[in-house]
Design a protein with these regions (language model features):
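Cytochrome P450 proximal C-terminal region
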Residues: 1-6, 11, 131-135, 151, ...
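Cytochrome P450 fold signature focused on the C-terminal beta-domain
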Residues: 232-238, 295-315, 328-348, 357, ...
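Conserved cytochrome P450 K-helix/beta-meander segment immediately N-terminal to the heme-binding cysteine loop
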Residues: 358-385
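N-terminal membrane-proximal hinge/A-helix region immediately C-terminal to the signal-anchor transmembrane segment
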Residues: 2-106, 121, 128-133, 171-172, ...
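Cytochrome P450 catalytic-core helices
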Residues: 272-297, 407-422
Length: 463
Protein backbone atom coordinates (compact mmCIF):
# COMPACT_ATOMS: atom_id res chain seq x y z
CA UNK A 1 0.00 0.00 0.00
CA UNK A 2 2.96 2.35 0.45
CA UNK A 3 4.36 3.12 -2.96
CA UNK A 4 7.25 5.03 -4.45
CA UNK A 5 6.34 4.47 -8.07
CA UNK A 6 8.56 6.08 -10.70
CA UNK A 7 7.35 9.41 -12.03
CA UNK A 8 6.59 9.52 -15.77
CA UNK A 9 8.22 12.97 -15.79
CA UNK A 10 11.33 11.75 -13.96
CA UNK A 11 10.46 13.63 -10.77
CA UNK A 12 11.07 12.47 -7.22
CA UNK A 13 8.13 10.51 -5.81
CA UNK A 14 7.93 10.56 -1.99
CA UNK A 15 6.11 7.89 0.06
CA UNK A 16 2.40 7.54 -0.60
CA UNK A 17 -0.57 5.35 0.20
CA UNK A 18 -2.43 4.20 -2.89
CA UNK A 19 -5.10 1.51 -2.41
CA UNK A 20 -4.79 -1.70 -4.46
CA UNK A 21 -6.31 -1.81 -7.93
CA UNK A 22 -8.72 -4.63 -7.09
CA UNK A 23 -11.68 -3.39 -5.07
CA UNK A 24 -11.83 -5.42 -1.84
CA UNK A 25 -15.11 -6.40 -0.21
CA UNK A 26 -16.66 -3.68 1.95
CA UNK A 27 -15.93 -5.75 5.08
CA UNK A 28 -12.23 -5.85 4.16
CA UNK A 29 -12.26 -2.09 3.77
CA UNK A 30 -13.96 -1.80 7.15
CA UNK A 31 -11.27 -3.90 8.81
CA UNK A 32 -8.51 -1.70 7.37
CA UNK A 33 -10.05 1.66 8.27
CA UNK A 34 -9.36 2.01 12.02
CA UNK A 35 -5.59 1.70 11.65
CA UNK A 36 -5.30 3.88 8.56
CA UNK A 37 -8.43 5.38 7.04
CA UNK A 38 -7.03 5.68 3.53
CA UNK A 39 -6.64 1.90 3.47
CA UNK A 40 -10.44 1.83 3.68
CA UNK A 41 -10.85 3.73 0.42
CA UNK A 42 -11.13 2.24 -3.03
CA UNK A 43 -8.60 3.19 -5.69
CA UNK A 44 -11.63 4.48 -7.60
CA UNK A 45 -11.59 7.52 -5.31
CA UNK A 46 -8.36 8.61 -7.05
CA UNK A 47 -9.91 8.27 -10.53
CA UNK A 48 -13.65 8.93 -10.31
CA UNK A 49 -15.82 11.86 -9.22
CA UNK A 50 -17.86 10.01 -6.62
CA UNK A 51 -17.71 6.63 -4.87
CA UNK A 52 -19.92 4.80 -2.43
CA UNK A 53 -18.91 1.36 -1.10
CA UNK A 54 -22.46 0.33 -0.14
CA UNK A 55 -25.98 1.85 -0.22
CA UNK A 56 -25.97 2.86 3.47
CA UNK A 57 -22.38 4.12 3.73
CA UNK A 58 -21.09 7.67 3.33
CA UNK A 59 -20.48 9.04 -0.15
CA UNK A 60 -16.93 10.10 -1.09
CA UNK A 61 -16.92 13.09 -3.46
CA UNK A 62 -13.96 14.52 -5.40
CA UNK A 63 -15.63 16.39 -8.28
CA UNK A 64 -14.68 20.10 -7.97
CA UNK A 65 -18.06 21.26 -9.25
CA UNK A 66 -19.83 19.24 -6.55
CA UNK A 67 -17.37 20.44 -3.92
CA UNK A 68 -18.08 24.06 -4.80
CA UNK A 69 -21.77 23.40 -4.13
CA UNK A 70 -20.99 21.66 -0.82
CA UNK A 71 -18.60 24.30 0.51
CA UNK A 72 -19.87 27.52 -1.08
CA UNK A 73 -22.97 27.73 -3.26
CA UNK A 74 -25.20 25.51 -1.09
CA UNK A 75 -23.16 25.44 2.11
CA UNK A 76 -26.22 25.75 4.37
CA UNK A 77 -27.58 22.52 2.86
CA UNK A 78 -24.40 20.66 3.86
CA UNK A 79 -23.79 21.19 7.61
CA UNK A 80 -21.10 19.39 9.58
CA UNK A 81 -23.46 16.80 11.04
CA UNK A 82 -23.86 14.69 14.17
CA UNK A 83 -20.70 12.60 13.76
CA UNK A 84 -18.53 15.70 13.47
CA UNK A 85 -20.08 17.12 16.63
CA UNK A 86 -19.65 13.84 18.48
CA UNK A 87 -15.97 13.61 17.55
CA UNK A 88 -14.94 17.23 17.99
CA UNK A 89 -17.15 18.88 20.57
CA UNK A 90 -15.08 17.26 23.33
CA UNK A 91 -12.21 19.28 21.89
CA UNK A 92 -13.94 22.45 20.77
CA UNK A 93 -17.14 22.55 22.85
CA UNK A 94 -19.56 25.22 21.62
CA UNK A 95 -16.82 27.30 19.99
CA UNK A 96 -16.62 28.61 16.45
CA UNK A 97 -15.14 25.42 15.02
CA UNK A 98 -18.26 23.36 15.81
CA UNK A 99 -20.97 26.05 16.02
CA UNK A 100 -23.58 26.38 13.29
CA UNK A 101 -25.85 29.19 12.05
CA UNK A 102 -26.01 32.51 13.90
CA UNK A 103 -23.81 31.25 16.76
CA UNK A 104 -21.08 30.42 14.25
CA UNK A 105 -21.37 33.70 12.33
CA UNK A 106 -20.81 36.07 15.24
CA UNK A 107 -18.08 33.96 16.84
CA UNK A 108 -16.28 33.74 13.51
CA UNK A 109 -16.47 37.50 13.03
CA UNK A 110 -15.19 38.12 16.56
CA UNK A 111 -12.25 35.72 16.18
CA UNK A 112 -11.21 36.59 12.64
CA UNK A 113 -9.56 39.87 13.66
CA UNK A 114 -6.71 37.91 15.26
CA UNK A 115 -5.89 36.30 11.91
CA UNK A 116 -5.96 39.29 9.56
CA UNK A 117 -2.82 39.42 7.37
CA UNK A 118 -1.61 42.68 8.94
CA UNK A 119 -2.02 41.25 12.44
CA UNK A 120 -0.37 37.97 11.49
CA UNK A 121 2.69 39.60 9.93
CA UNK A 122 3.42 41.40 13.21
CA UNK A 123 3.92 37.98 14.84
CA UNK A 124 6.90 37.04 12.64
CA UNK A 125 9.59 37.93 15.24
CA UNK A 126 7.98 35.61 17.79
CA UNK A 127 7.80 32.78 15.23
CA UNK A 128 11.45 33.28 14.26
CA UNK A 129 12.65 33.43 17.87
CA UNK A 130 10.86 30.22 18.84
CA UNK A 131 12.18 28.44 15.74
CA UNK A 132 15.76 29.56 16.32
CA UNK A 133 15.63 28.23 19.89
CA UNK A 134 14.14 24.93 18.73
CA UNK A 135 16.68 24.35 15.94
CA UNK A 136 19.56 25.08 18.31
CA UNK A 137 18.14 22.50 20.72
CA UNK A 138 17.66 19.89 17.97
CA UNK A 139 21.25 20.29 16.76
CA UNK A 140 22.56 19.85 20.31
CA UNK A 141 20.42 16.78 21.01
CA UNK A 142 21.26 15.21 17.67
CA UNK A 143 24.94 15.08 18.62
CA UNK A 144 23.99 12.17 20.90
CA UNK A 145 21.12 10.49 19.03
CA UNK A 146 18.64 11.15 16.24
CA UNK A 147 15.82 13.54 17.13
CA UNK A 148 12.22 12.58 16.38
CA UNK A 149 11.07 15.74 14.63
CA UNK A 150 7.39 14.82 14.76
CA UNK A 151 6.92 15.61 18.49
CA UNK A 152 9.69 18.21 18.34
CA UNK A 153 7.95 20.23 15.63
CA UNK A 154 4.60 19.79 17.38
CA UNK A 155 6.12 21.28 20.53
CA UNK A 156 7.53 24.16 18.47
CA UNK A 157 4.16 25.03 16.91
CA UNK A 158 2.49 24.72 20.34
CA UNK A 159 5.00 27.19 21.80
CA UNK A 160 4.37 29.56 18.89
CA UNK A 161 0.59 29.50 19.45
CA UNK A 162 1.08 30.21 23.16
CA UNK A 163 3.60 33.01 22.46
CA UNK A 164 1.61 34.69 19.69
CA UNK A 165 -2.05 34.19 20.64
CA UNK A 166 -1.94 33.88 24.44
CA UNK A 167 0.83 36.37 25.30
CA UNK A 168 3.08 33.68 26.68
CA UNK A 169 0.56 31.64 28.66
CA UNK A 170 1.91 32.39 32.12
CA UNK A 171 -1.26 31.05 33.75
CA UNK A 172 -0.60 27.39 32.96
CA UNK A 173 2.31 24.99 32.86
CA UNK A 174 3.32 24.53 29.21
CA UNK A 175 4.81 21.08 29.64
CA UNK A 176 1.75 19.82 31.49
CA UNK A 177 -0.69 21.30 28.99
CA UNK A 178 1.26 19.89 26.02
CA UNK A 179 1.27 16.43 27.63
CA UNK A 180 -2.49 16.65 28.16
CA UNK A 181 -3.04 17.73 24.57
CA UNK A 182 -0.94 14.81 23.28
CA UNK A 183 -3.00 12.38 25.37
CA UNK A 184 -6.19 13.96 24.07
CA UNK A 185 -5.14 13.56 20.43
CA UNK A 186 -4.14 9.94 20.99
CA UNK A 187 -7.62 9.29 22.35
CA UNK A 188 -9.53 11.23 19.72
CA UNK A 189 -7.50 9.47 17.02
CA UNK A 190 -9.02 6.09 17.87
CA UNK A 191 -11.32 5.73 14.92
CA UNK A 192 -14.39 3.57 15.47
CA UNK A 193 -15.92 1.55 12.64
CA UNK A 194 -19.22 3.31 13.29
CA UNK A 195 -17.56 6.56 12.20
CA UNK A 196 -17.01 5.21 8.72
CA UNK A 197 -19.97 3.01 8.02
CA UNK A 198 -23.07 3.98 10.02
CA UNK A 199 -25.47 6.79 9.01
CA UNK A 200 -24.91 10.22 10.50
CA UNK A 201 -28.17 10.09 12.46
CA UNK A 202 -26.76 7.19 14.52
CA UNK A 203 -24.38 9.61 16.21
CA UNK A 204 -26.92 12.28 17.14
CA UNK A 205 -27.48 11.11 20.72
CA UNK A 206 -24.36 9.06 21.35
CA UNK A 207 -22.19 10.10 24.30
CA UNK A 208 -19.01 12.07 23.67
CA UNK A 209 -16.17 9.59 23.40
CA UNK A 210 -13.41 11.80 24.77
CA UNK A 211 -14.92 14.07 27.45
CA UNK A 212 -12.83 12.74 30.34
CA UNK A 213 -9.64 14.22 28.86
CA UNK A 214 -11.23 17.60 28.13
CA UNK A 215 -11.80 18.90 31.66
CA UNK A 216 -8.16 19.21 32.84
CA UNK A 217 -7.34 21.21 29.71
CA UNK A 218 -10.36 23.47 30.11
CA UNK A 219 -9.56 24.07 33.78
CA UNK A 220 -6.17 25.53 32.82
CA UNK A 221 -7.69 27.75 30.15
CA UNK A 222 -10.58 28.97 32.33
CA UNK A 223 -8.13 29.94 35.04
CA UNK A 224 -6.26 32.06 32.49
CA UNK A 225 -9.48 33.69 31.20
CA UNK A 226 -10.64 34.57 34.72
CA UNK A 227 -7.29 36.15 35.53
CA UNK A 228 -7.15 38.11 32.27
CA UNK A 229 -10.55 39.76 32.86
CA UNK A 230 -9.04 41.91 35.60
CA UNK A 231 -5.80 42.79 33.78
CA UNK A 232 -4.96 45.49 31.21
CA UNK A 233 -5.54 44.46 27.60
CA UNK A 234 -2.61 42.98 25.67
CA UNK A 235 -4.22 42.90 22.23
CA UNK A 236 -3.99 39.13 21.78
CA UNK A 237 -6.64 36.52 20.97
CA UNK A 238 -7.79 36.35 24.60
CA UNK A 239 -8.54 40.08 24.65
CA UNK A 240 -10.40 39.90 21.34
CA UNK A 241 -12.66 37.19 22.72
CA UNK A 242 -13.18 39.03 26.02
CA UNK A 243 -14.35 42.09 24.09
CA UNK A 244 -16.41 40.21 21.49
CA UNK A 245 -20.09 41.15 21.15
CA UNK A 246 -22.79 39.78 18.87
CA UNK A 247 -23.82 42.77 16.68
CA UNK A 248 -27.41 41.54 16.47
CA UNK A 249 -28.14 40.56 20.07
CA UNK A 250 -25.42 42.30 22.07
CA UNK A 251 -24.45 38.93 23.56
CA UNK A 252 -20.91 38.55 24.86
CA UNK A 253 -18.91 35.39 25.51
CA UNK A 254 -18.90 33.95 28.99
CA UNK A 255 -15.77 32.30 30.35
CA UNK A 256 -16.92 28.85 29.22
CA UNK A 257 -17.39 29.91 25.59
CA UNK A 258 -14.11 31.83 25.54
CA UNK A 259 -12.36 28.75 26.93
CA UNK A 260 -13.97 26.57 24.23
CA UNK A 261 -12.68 28.87 21.51
CA UNK A 262 -9.19 29.17 22.97
CA UNK A 263 -8.95 25.40 23.35
CA UNK A 264 -10.08 24.96 19.76
CA UNK A 265 -7.50 27.41 18.45
CA UNK A 266 -4.71 25.80 20.49
CA UNK A 267 -5.60 22.32 19.23
CA UNK A 268 -6.33 23.18 15.60
CA UNK A 269 -3.68 25.87 15.41
CA UNK A 270 -0.62 23.80 16.18
CA UNK A 271 -1.31 20.12 15.46
CA UNK A 272 -2.24 20.54 11.80
CA UNK A 273 0.62 22.93 11.03
CA UNK A 274 3.10 20.64 12.74
CA UNK A 275 2.01 17.65 10.64
CA UNK A 276 2.65 19.53 7.40
CA UNK A 277 6.03 20.73 8.65
CA UNK A 278 7.00 17.22 9.75
CA UNK A 279 6.51 16.01 6.17
CA UNK A 280 8.36 19.09 4.90
CA UNK A 281 11.33 18.12 7.07
CA UNK A 282 11.37 14.74 5.33
CA UNK A 283 11.43 16.52 1.97
CA UNK A 284 14.50 18.51 3.08
CA UNK A 285 16.25 15.30 4.15
CA UNK A 286 15.26 13.06 1.23
CA UNK A 287 15.52 15.63 -1.54
CA UNK A 288 18.75 17.61 -1.01
CA UNK A 289 18.14 19.71 -4.13
CA UNK A 290 15.11 21.24 -2.44
CA UNK A 291 17.00 21.94 0.78
CA UNK A 292 19.81 23.60 -1.16
CA UNK A 293 17.46 25.73 -3.24
CA UNK A 294 15.68 26.99 -0.11
CA UNK A 295 19.05 27.79 1.49
CA UNK A 296 20.10 29.74 -1.59
CA UNK A 297 16.81 31.63 -1.61
CA UNK A 298 17.14 32.57 2.06
CA UNK A 299 20.78 33.60 1.47
CA UNK A 300 19.67 35.92 -1.33
CA UNK A 301 16.69 37.39 0.52
CA UNK A 302 18.19 37.53 4.03
CA UNK A 303 22.01 37.83 3.78
CA UNK A 304 22.27 38.58 7.50
CA UNK A 305 20.07 38.80 10.55
CA UNK A 306 16.73 37.14 11.29
CA UNK A 307 13.92 36.60 8.82
CA UNK A 308 11.37 39.42 9.12
CA UNK A 309 7.80 40.00 7.98
CA UNK A 310 9.15 41.91 4.97
CA UNK A 311 11.29 38.94 3.93
CA UNK A 312 8.53 36.31 4.08
CA UNK A 313 6.72 37.29 0.82
CA UNK A 314 10.07 37.15 -1.01
CA UNK A 315 10.65 33.49 -0.06
CA UNK A 316 8.75 32.40 -3.16
CA UNK A 317 10.23 28.94 -3.67
CA UNK A 318 9.94 28.13 0.02
CA UNK A 319 6.22 28.92 -0.18
CA UNK A 320 5.93 26.71 -3.28
CA UNK A 321 7.50 23.83 -1.34
CA UNK A 322 5.06 24.34 1.54
CA UNK A 323 2.13 24.37 -0.90
CA UNK A 324 3.31 21.17 -2.60
CA UNK A 325 3.87 19.40 0.73
CA UNK A 326 0.31 20.35 1.74
CA UNK A 327 -0.91 18.89 -1.55
CA UNK A 328 0.87 15.58 -1.06
CA UNK A 329 0.32 15.36 2.70
CA UNK A 330 -2.74 17.42 3.67
CA UNK A 331 -2.99 17.28 7.49
CA UNK A 332 -6.78 17.41 7.21
CA UNK A 333 -6.91 14.43 4.86
CA UNK A 334 -10.70 14.04 5.17
CA UNK A 335 -13.48 16.62 5.52
CA UNK A 336 -17.09 15.73 6.29
CA UNK A 337 -20.51 17.21 5.70
CA UNK A 338 -24.08 15.89 5.77
CA UNK A 339 -26.75 16.33 3.09
CA UNK A 340 -29.59 18.19 4.80
CA UNK A 341 -31.94 17.33 1.94
CA UNK A 342 -32.04 14.88 -0.95
CA UNK A 343 -29.88 16.03 -3.85
CA UNK A 344 -27.66 14.85 -6.69
CA UNK A 345 -23.88 15.07 -6.49
CA UNK A 346 -21.64 14.20 -9.44
CA UNK A 347 -24.50 12.22 -10.97
CA UNK A 348 -25.30 10.20 -7.83
CA UNK A 349 -28.59 10.60 -5.97
CA UNK A 350 -27.88 11.36 -2.32
CA UNK A 351 -30.65 11.07 0.25
CA UNK A 352 -31.15 13.52 3.07
CA UNK A 353 -29.11 12.54 6.12
CA UNK A 354 -26.31 10.93 4.09
CA UNK A 355 -22.80 11.78 5.23
CA UNK A 356 -20.58 13.29 2.54
CA UNK A 357 -16.87 12.59 2.92
CA UNK A 358 -14.40 14.73 1.01
CA UNK A 359 -11.18 12.65 0.79
CA UNK A 360 -8.73 15.54 0.49
CA UNK A 361 -5.74 13.20 0.24
CA UNK A 362 -7.26 11.53 -2.84
CA UNK A 363 -8.48 14.85 -4.26
CA UNK A 364 -4.92 16.20 -4.12
CA UNK A 365 -3.65 13.12 -5.98
CA UNK A 366 -6.60 12.70 -8.33
CA UNK A 367 -5.66 11.35 -11.73
CA UNK A 368 -8.07 13.69 -13.54
CA UNK A 369 -6.99 16.84 -11.72
CA UNK A 370 -3.19 16.67 -11.52
CA UNK A 371 -0.35 15.75 -13.86
CA UNK A 372 2.02 13.20 -12.32
CA UNK A 373 -0.03 13.45 -9.11
CA UNK A 374 2.24 11.44 -6.79
CA UNK A 375 5.41 13.32 -7.75
CA UNK A 376 6.94 16.18 -5.78
CA UNK A 377 6.84 19.24 -8.04
CA UNK A 378 6.78 22.67 -6.35
CA UNK A 379 6.67 24.33 -9.77
CA UNK A 380 2.94 23.57 -9.80
CA UNK A 381 2.61 26.57 -7.47
CA UNK A 382 5.07 28.91 -9.20
CA UNK A 383 3.73 32.45 -9.79
CA UNK A 384 3.77 31.89 -13.55
CA UNK A 385 2.01 28.48 -13.38
CA UNK A 386 -1.75 28.24 -13.93
CA UNK A 387 -3.40 27.98 -10.50
CA UNK A 388 -5.09 24.69 -9.63
CA UNK A 389 -8.87 24.52 -9.64
CA UNK A 390 -10.01 26.18 -6.42
CA UNK A 391 -11.95 23.06 -5.43
CA UNK A 392 -9.25 20.57 -6.40
CA UNK A 393 -6.83 21.90 -3.76
CA UNK A 394 -8.23 22.18 -0.23
CA UNK A 395 -5.42 22.25 2.36
CA UNK A 396 -7.46 24.70 4.45
CA UNK A 397 -10.97 23.81 3.33
CA UNK A 398 -13.11 26.26 1.36
CA UNK A 399 -16.15 28.48 1.48
CA UNK A 400 -17.46 30.37 4.53
CA UNK A 401 -15.88 27.84 6.91
CA UNK A 402 -12.41 27.97 5.36
CA UNK A 403 -9.73 27.85 8.04
CA UNK A 404 -9.50 31.40 9.41
CA UNK A 405 -5.92 30.72 10.44
CA UNK A 406 -4.73 29.87 6.91
CA UNK A 407 -2.63 33.03 6.53
CA UNK A 408 -1.03 32.46 9.93
CA UNK A 409 -0.35 28.80 9.12
CA UNK A 410 1.29 29.64 5.79
CA UNK A 411 3.46 32.39 7.28
CA UNK A 412 4.46 30.13 10.15
CA UNK A 413 5.26 27.23 7.82
CA UNK A 414 7.33 29.35 5.42
CA UNK A 415 9.30 30.98 8.24
CA UNK A 416 9.94 27.71 10.07
CA UNK A 417 10.97 25.82 6.92
CA UNK A 418 13.24 28.65 5.77
CA UNK A 419 14.86 28.91 9.19
CA UNK A 420 15.32 25.15 9.43
CA UNK A 421 16.94 24.90 5.99
CA UNK A 422 19.08 27.95 6.72
CA UNK A 423 20.39 26.68 10.05
CA UNK A 424 20.44 22.89 9.72
CA UNK A 425 21.17 19.94 7.49
CA UNK A 426 18.77 17.00 7.93
CA UNK A 427 19.50 13.30 7.44
CA UNK A 428 16.63 10.84 7.78
CA UNK A 429 17.53 8.21 10.39
CA UNK A 430 14.69 5.74 9.87
CA UNK A 431 15.21 2.24 8.52
CA UNK A 432 12.74 2.77 5.68
CA UNK A 433 10.81 5.71 4.22
CA UNK A 434 7.98 6.87 6.50
CA UNK A 435 4.51 5.56 5.76
CA UNK A 436 1.67 8.10 5.90
CA UNK A 437 -0.90 6.98 8.47
CA UNK A 438 -4.33 8.61 8.29
CA UNK A 439 -6.06 8.46 11.65
CA UNK A 440 -6.76 11.89 13.13
CA UNK A 441 -4.20 13.63 10.92
CA UNK A 442 -1.83 12.38 8.21
CA UNK A 443 1.15 11.43 10.35
CA UNK A 444 4.29 9.42 9.56
CA UNK A 445 4.22 5.92 11.01
CA UNK A 446 7.01 5.59 13.55
CA UNK A 447 7.67 9.32 13.76
CA UNK A 448 10.31 11.27 11.85
CA UNK A 449 13.78 10.43 13.24
CA UNK A 450 16.42 12.86 11.99
CA UNK A 451 20.04 13.69 12.47
CA UNK A 452 20.13 17.47 12.67
CA UNK A 453 23.53 19.03 12.04
CA UNK A 454 24.75 22.54 11.31
CA UNK A 455 24.00 23.56 7.73
CA UNK A 456 26.83 23.87 5.20
CA UNK A 457 28.53 27.27 5.13
CA UNK A 458 26.95 28.52 8.35
CA UNK A 459 28.68 31.91 8.09
CA UNK A 460 26.33 32.75 5.25
CA UNK A 461 23.41 32.53 7.64
CA UNK A 462 24.85 34.47 10.56
CA UNK A 463 22.18 36.01 12.73
Amino acid sequence: MTLQAPSPDGLWTPPAIIPPEADPHVLVLAARSPGNQIRGWSRKVFYEDVWRPAPTTPVLVTQPEALRRIFLDEAEDFPQGALFRRMFRPAWGQGVLTAEGAAWRWQRHASATAFRPATVSELTPLIVAATERAVTEWIAKSAKAPVDLEPAITRLTFDIIVDTMLSGGEYFDRDQMKARISAFFRDIGRIRLSYMFLPDAYHGHRPDAHSKLREPLLADIRRMVTARRSLPARGDLVDLLLAAKDPETGQTMDDALIADNIMGFILAGHETTSVGLTWASYVLAAHPTTAQRIREEVRAVVPQGPITADHAPQLVHTRQVVSEVLRLYPPGFLLTRVAAKTCELAGLKVRAGTRINIPVYALHRHRKRWRDPDAFDPSRFAPEAPPPDRYAYLPFGAGPRICMGAAFAMLESVVILATLARRADLTFAGRKPPEPVAVFALRPKGGMPMRVTVAPDPKSYAT
